[in-house]
A protein has these predicted regions:
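N-terminal secretory signal peptides
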Residues: 1-10, 14-23
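Extracytoplasmic ligand-binding site segments that recognize negatively charged/polar headgroups
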Residues: 55-66, 78-96, 101-229, 233-236
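A ligand-binding cleft/hinge motif common to bilobed small-molecule-binding domains
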Residues: 112-116, 238-257
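Periplasmic-binding protein-like
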Residues: 151-152, 180-190, 211-215, 220-222, 254-280, 293-317
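A bilobed periplasmic-binding-protein/Venus flytrap-type ligand-binding module shared by bacterial periplasmic
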Residues: 155-162, 200, 270-282, 301-302
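Extracellular/periplasmic bilobal clamshell ligand-binding domains
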Residues: 298, 317-354
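Short, polar/charged alpha-helical segment
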Residues: 35-46, 50-52, 56-75, 156
Length: 354
């Protein structure tokens, strides 16, 4: 069977007719009022009995989240479909292009995806009550079409058995030192939303010339932002150029020899939004899951177990974890990522020859 590769531009082009004839509306609807989890919603969800959750979360946490939901709402099963954010984006485009409606709720690690899905008219408006009460408006769409579920950072990290603290890199510039040649690992922007945003922000702030120099360092290329922390924890490489900061924190807490570095130039940032699809085959179960996923209970699980940052104001960070406000961050720009995504992938592939 021939496999077709979809670019972001392909997604836009293939979806135009469908969006115009099926989903588009001549009038912009008012944002819905905030919705609580009601007995009626729970009962309707139980009648559907299931939902499909496409997510870029690491599999262990996605399954933990799904299991906790199933315990809270017996009779509603969650099927977790985990992949890299960019792969999820392509998969949904292929399914919708073939008039296949499978996904109920999506969580991505690339805000740019929601720009496309919203433009295509694929998302259902839904505003969970706790989002309206406890999330800053910057973390949810004004039309209530998507909500930032988690806030991700992509720092540098290293294996403490292989690198002494005093020798560890402190900046992206330090990674160009010849002593790190053949000792680093990096994720790929064509697979991971976190890495797509990290690559865009680093290229914007430091220039593509930085990556041209980095490529000469014989960097091991892997796919996911969740792969790079594993490589340094196992000692397969000494330094992580980018990747899931929360996994480095989790691995360190579990006793693995890893340490996080917040680079002097700034740490790349990526919001991880979730949305309910308008054509969801299980719309009530989808809304129940989306609502609960943004409750304080689920968001605290995100903080405590996944070690990720939450936009929910009532969550409490564990002692010893650096607060997001205390980290120098690069600026997220999903609009530019949406416009430049294909160019980023192409230029990256040319530089790293992958």
């Amino acid at each position: 069977m021939t496999k077709h590769r979809f670019s972001r531009r392909d997604v836009l082009n293939s979806a135009t007719a469908l969006a115009a004839t099926v989903f588009a509306s001549p009038l912009r609807a008012a944002a819905p009022e905030a919705s609580a989890i009601t007995p009626a919603l729970v009962e309707a969800a139980k009648k559907e009995g299931k939902l499909a959750f496409y997510t870029a979360m690491d599999l262990a946490f996605a399954e933990r989240l799904a299991k906790t939901f199933e315990e809270r709402f017996p009779g509603v099963a969650v099927r977790v479909e985990r992949s890299g954010a960019e792969r999820i984006f392509t998969r949904i485009a292929q399914e919708y292009g073939g008039n296949i409606n499978v996904v109920d709720v999506v969580n991505t690690a690339d805000q740019a995806h929601c720009i496309v899905w919203k433009r295509n008219g694929w998302l259902a408006p839904y505003l969970p009550e706790e989002v309206a009460k406890h999330f800053d408006p910057q973390y949810y769409d004004p039309d209530a079409l998507h909500v930032t579920t988690r806030i991700l950072i992509s720092p540098i990290a290293y294996n403490t058995n292989l690198v002494k603290k005093e020798d560890a890199p402190k900046s992206f510039a330090d990674l160009l030192d010849p002593k790190w040649a053949g000792k680093m690992v990096k994720g790929h922007p064509a697979y991971s939303g976190t890495i797509m945003n990290s690559t865009f922000q680093t290229a914007r702030d430091l220039g593509w010339g930085y990556f041209e120099k980095l490529a000469k360092q014989r960097v091991l290329q892997v796919q996911s932002a969740t792969d790079t922390p594993k490589k340094i924890a196992l000692g397969e490489r000494a330094v992580m150029v980018d990747g899931a900061g929360y996994l480095v924190i989790r691995n360190k807490e579990e006793g693995q020899p890893v340490e996080i570095v917040y680079p002097e130039e700034g740490t790349p940032l990526a919001g991880g939004p979730s949305a309910v699809f308008k054509a969801a085959p299980n719309p009530n179960a989808a809304r129940l899951f989306q609502n609960w996923m943004h409750s304080r209970e689920a968001q605290q699980l995100l903080v405590d177990w996944a070690r990720q940052y939450s936009p929910h104001r009532q969550t409490v960070e564990k002692p010893g974890i650096r607060k997001l406000a205390d980290i120098k961050l690069m600026k997220e720009d999903p609009e530019s990522v949406e416009k430049m995504g294909d160019e980023i992938k192409m230029r990256y592939a040319q530089i790293f020859k992958v």
